[in-house]
Structure formats: C-alpha cells, structure tokens
Amino acid sequence: ILEVVGGIAVGGVVALASWRVANGDMQVGDVIAFVTTLILMVQPVRAIGTLNAITQEGLAACERILTLLDTPRKIIDRPGATALVVKQGQVDYNNVGFAYAKDAIAALDGISFTARAGQTIALVGPSGAGKSTLINLLPRFFEATSGTISIDGQPIDGVNINSLRKAVSLVSQESVLFDDTIAANIGFGRDGASRAAIEVAARDAAADEFIQALPDGYDTYVGAMGNRLSGGQRQRIAIARAMLKDAPILLLDEATAALDAKSEQQVRSALQKLQAGRTTLVVAHHLTTVRNADLILVL
C-alpha cells in the first residue's frame, strides 16, 4: 500500500509541477529541488512501514510466548516431595499403564521390568507400540496413569522433578540445539561447566575433531535447531552434552535412526562410551543398535 501511495504521490507532484512550469508559475529549479526532496523522503517512509510490520510480528510472537509461559504445568511436584537420591541407578517399572486421554485406548498397559544398575535394556517393536512413551514416563514428561516407576526404590511421583531430571540424560532422534555457540550448547548439560570440561566431553563424544575444523571452533554458532550442522554433528553435540551432564541414567530414543552409515558408526562409538557404567534404556529399530544390550524387551 505504501509503495502504491508513494508512486501516486510522486506522479501527482510531477504532473502538477509540470503544469505550473508550463503556466510560468514555477521555475524548473524549484521543481527539481522539490521532487528531489520528495524522493529522499521515500526511503525513510518505507523504513517506517517495515518497522511497523516487524513490530506487529514481534507483538504477536510476544503474545504467543506469554500465553505459553502463563500455561500452568500439568505435572508438578506433589506436596512433601523429596529430592531423589541415586545410589546405584536401578530402575523399576511395576505394572505401568498410560493413556494420552481419559477415554483413549491405553498406549501402555501392565508393563513391568527391572533395569539393574549399569544394565542396558533395549526396547523394540513396531511403530506406535509405545517405546518412546515408555521412556518419556521416566523423567515425567508424561504421568503414568497406573502402576509405579521407581529409581533405587523411590517412586518418581514422590520426588522433586528437578532432582529427577538431573539424574536422567536423554539423547533423542531429533537433537534439541539452540541458536548459540557449540560450547554453549554442550554447556547446557551442566550449569557452570568450565571450557575445559566442555572440550573433554566433546572429545569423549568424538565431536572435537569436526568442531576444531570449523572457522570459529567451539565459538561457532550452530543456527536455529543446529541447521548449520549435519545430522551426525548435531547428534555428537547432543551426546557431548549428555557426557557433560554425567547423569547415572541414560535414555536413548532412536539416537541413530536418521543418520547415514558413516555418521551412524561415529555416533554409535560415542554412545558406547556414554553408556559405560550407566543404566540405559534404548529405543531402536536396528538390531545393530541393541546387540550389546543385557535385555531386549519386545512391545
């Protein structure tokens, strides 16, 4: 609209000025000065229009953000919740059931198993069987509708959520990276982590080599959701973050499913280091991913 109005205004001024010059009411120099001034005003007016559009977009985004922030959490600490104390890292699912809605068909029903400290438990089965749902119940992303889940004998619904999630690391198929530097993305694994600790975690995750090859190294910005990195690079940064967090319980949700063969081999080597000494629940479709598991559960 501003472009059209501006064009009409300039055209009208030129036409009027030409008519007045022809009638001897204005000098040509006056017309040139006036038109030049008008043209110089076009860009600032356009900038104001652009600024208004950006402001409106920002206000709409703020409204969505505030709506999200004001949404009450469905899963909160229960009265009297205590901090989780992990001594060994044994995980027990006892007759666990879950449905996404009250009247919905149960996604899980009567699931019971024990993952002893340091064991790797593989969860396999067709898509939609509830494998990802099963591991998402452990950090209480969802709340089990029946049964109990315990860590070292402590029911997770009776412990503080922050302490529970500090004890669990998750590496999923889609790595969550922020539009920040590589060092900052790895550092999210542990508050106040030193640069040296971040670099050690990256080396353990087989990420240091490709990071050092980047122009800015650990200070390279990864872009929104890590879109400046390949899938394998994103996964190794996510693994480095889990290495840095050093939680006793590890959840792997198809962490290598979307990778090519070369990237998968690099990531799998890093995952084997990450699993060492940790109680691990693995969701996978490839048999190569679960061949070293202590127990394979079919859903």
Language model feature labels by segment:
Residues I1-A33, T55:
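A hydrophobic transmembrane-helix motif
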Residues L40-L68:
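Cytosolic ends of transmembrane helices, especially the final helix of ABC transmembrane type-1 domains
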Residues D77-R78, T82-L299:
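ABC-type nucleotide-binding domain
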Residues A15-W19, E63, E254:
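Transmembrane alpha-helix boundary and packing residues in multipass membrane permease domains
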Residues G7, A33-P44:
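Small-residue-enriched core segments of transmembrane alpha-helices in multipass membrane transport
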Residues T67, K74, G187:
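Conserved E/DxxT/N motif and adjacent residues on the DHp alpha2 helix
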Residues G6-V13, E57, S194, P248, ...:
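Residue-level signal for transmembrane alpha-helical positions in Major Facilitator Superfamily
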Residues A9-L16, Q43, A60, A206:
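Transmembrane alpha-helix boundary/anchor motif
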